């Protein structure tokens, strides 16, 4: 009986400790990923002021996520032409490819963003097929 009681006491001490360690780990990972995820979300949801502030602070506008997508890829995919145009004019890499092998110009064509596609072309943008020639 004493042995069983000691085991219960040990578990009562152990579980809060594990929970505390897991909470610290989660908070640390959350803080590490917060800035990158937030900026990609800003491109997806059309938060142009956040994007402009990010770029004006000199941060990497060609940062790629786990899918190889950049702010320009996401703004094109989401139809936020104002952000896309701002990024192109700010000299984002217009020929960077995502993990699907698609360039920003491929996305502009696919999303039928004619004006943005023209601008990307003016800044030297090419399609995947053109890059592979």
Question: What residues fall within each predicted segment?
Answer:
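Ankyrin repeat A-helix N-terminal signature
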Residues: 41-47, 74-80, 107-113
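Ankyrin repeat structural motif
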Residues: 47-55, 80-89, 113-122
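Extracytoplasmic/periplasmic/luminal assembly and interaction segments
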Residues: 63-69, 73-83, 89
């Amino acid at each position: 009986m004493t042995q069983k009681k000691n085991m219960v006491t040990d578990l009562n001490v152990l579980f809060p400790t594990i929970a505390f360690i897991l909470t610290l780990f989660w908070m640390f990972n959350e803080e590490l990923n917060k800035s990158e995820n937030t900026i990609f979300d800003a491109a997806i949801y059309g938060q142009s002021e956040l994007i402009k502030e990010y770029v004006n602070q000199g941060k990497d506008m060609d940062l790629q996520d786990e899918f190889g997508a950049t702010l320009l890829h996401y703004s094109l995919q989401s139809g936020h032409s104002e952000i896309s145009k701002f990024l192109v004019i700010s000299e984002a890499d217009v020929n960077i490819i995502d993990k699907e092998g698609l360039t920003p110009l491929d996305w502009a064509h696919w999303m039928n963003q004619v004006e943005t596609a023209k601008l990307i072309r003016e800044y030297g943008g090419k399609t995947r097929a053109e890059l592979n020639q």
